Amino acid sequence: MALVLHCGSGNKNAFKALIAAEYTGVKVELTKNFEMGVSNKTPEFLKMNPLGKIPVLETPEGAVFESNAIARYVARLKDNSSLCGSSLIDYSHIEQWMDFSATEVDANIGRWLYPRLGFGPYVPVLEEFAITSLKRSLGALNTHLASNTYLVGHSVTLADIVMTCNLYYGFVRILIKSFTSEFPHVERYFWTMVNQPNFKKVIGDFKQAESVPPVQKKAAPPKESKAKEAKKEAPKEAPKPKVEASEEEEAPKPKPKNPLDLLPPSKMILDEWKRLYSNTKTNFREIAIKGFWDMYDPEGYSLWFCDYKYNDENTVSFVTMNKVGGFLQRMDLCRKYAFGKMLVIGSTPPFKVKGLWLFRGQDIPKFVMDEVYDMELYEWTKVDLSDEAQKERVNAMIEDQEPFEGEDLLDAKCFK
């Protein structure tokens, strides 16, 4: 009998076995019309996996569950498969990277994503920990891939299949470009893998996530008691204007506009400034800085300095940089209305964190102060443009001038 993979289409854990099958030539059939919550609750399915989890591979010798175990089984059905390496050390390194992918990459993507989708409580501190852990893991992966095309050896192995499938889930759900661009070798590796014919045949075409999913808010409990009371009080004989009442009650409320969209039009087009900033590669001060002040509208926008209040805690460089990166991720909700530069300053700890922000309007937007908890960790000072020293400081921060205020720059990040 052919191998049967019990799972819905589009599942990244099923992709692992299906891609391995493309490399080995093993025939694996994906069950048709699989319905999660129904198909995996049948007595037949529960005999194969008592927990009802997917995927499950049905073989002539019995069922196999857990996606990595299934992928191993498919890969080893072909003698001397290159997917499993050519030596004991290759095999060990493949297992090493498969474990790393599961515990350091996939797990941290899930810890960041699932609470935002409502699968568990959303706790900002735990999210920050998940993001920091994921960045640390991707940093290690990035270092390895700086000098390696594949995770192990000189061709695709099972380690690459598992890693790519786990990264795929992150790329399509939560890992936006501004996040992944910090790991250029991981990006290069990922896009190279998913465009390999055997990967592409299974995964198909897709786009990288453009925004981090918003936190799902719990729906208000239905007011059953009031509805029942109203029902009792209503006279049976009295005619009810059913259609009109239902239309009024069910009419969707118009989505409230962002207060910043109601401000008077500004001569400054923020996207034009962002394009100028991104496209200026030489003579930055003469082109980009001059262009900024030519565009700047002091009535429609305001500039703000921010200084981290707890710099004495910034004793580890990568933790400090990850802290700033997490802040910028959470600022994504105001990308339409803001531009920012964040600098990590100093060659030895404790490191200083300072920033410059351009916001629509004359104040820091209220929805940013309400939603981004990092805001209260910084001291905010509005830039006084009548002070030439402050204006020059703006220039230096936009330009990533080094040294900055007499100190080395450890890192500079841009929010645009």
Swiss-Prot record:
Gene3D superfamilies: 1.20.1050.10, Glutaredoxin, Translation elongation factor EF1B, gamma chain, conserved domain. Residues 87-215 form the GST C-terminal domain. Residues 256-416 form the EF-1-gamma C-terminal domain. The keyword Protein biosynthesis applies. The keyword Disulfide bond does not apply. Residues 221-245 have a biased composition (Basic and acidic residues). It holds the Pfam family GST_N. InterPro entries: EF-1-gamma_plant, EF1B_G_C, EF1B_G_C_sf, Glutathione-S-Trfase_C-like, Glutathione-S-Trfase_C_sf, Glutathione_S-Trfase, Glutathione_S-Trfase_N, GST_C. Keywords: Elongation factor, Protein biosynthesis. Residues 213-263 are annotated as: Disordered. Residues 1-82 form the GST N-terminal domain. GO terms for molecular function: glutathione transferase activity; translation elongation factor activity. EF-1 is composed of four subunits: alpha, beta, delta, and gamma. Probably plays a role in anchoring the complex to other cellular components. PANTHER family: ELONGATION FACTOR 1-GAMMA 1-RELATED, ELONGATION FACTOR 1-GAMMA 3. This is Elongation factor 1-gamma 3. It comes from Oryza sativa subsp. japonica.
